[in-house]
A protein has these predicted regions:
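N-terminal Rossmann-like dinucleotide-binding module
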Residues: 1-73
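Short acidic low-complexity segments
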Residues: 50-51, 79-83
Length: 83
């Protein structure tokens, strides 16, 4: 298993959400609350078999804002946050 850490966010850049949701799958309610409607709609239109990797997972997340970290964790099924 390849373990991936998602580190940081930047304004206007939803890649932490899109990459994490594609790798881990996503929680529909959590992703809907993330504020990234474009990403939410994109992954919802994909077949579930297009989302997730058997040999990789985003296991840890840290961002500059603890509330953002919690939103990303909830949206993308990331088990651990880093302070």
């Amino acid at each position: 298993m390849i373990k991936i850490g998602m580190v940081g966010v930047s304004p206007g850049n939803g890649h932490p959400y899109s990459f994490s949701s594609i790798i881990n799958g996503y929680d529909p309610d959590g992703l809907a609350r993330s504020g990234w409607d474009v990403i939410y709609n994109y992954v919802r239109e994909r077949d579930r078999s297009d989302v997730g990797f058997d040999d990789a997972a985003v296991t840890h997340v840290w961002t500059q804002d603890s509330d953002e970290t919690k939103r990303l964790q909830a949206a993308c099924k990331i088990p651990h946050t880093v302070d």
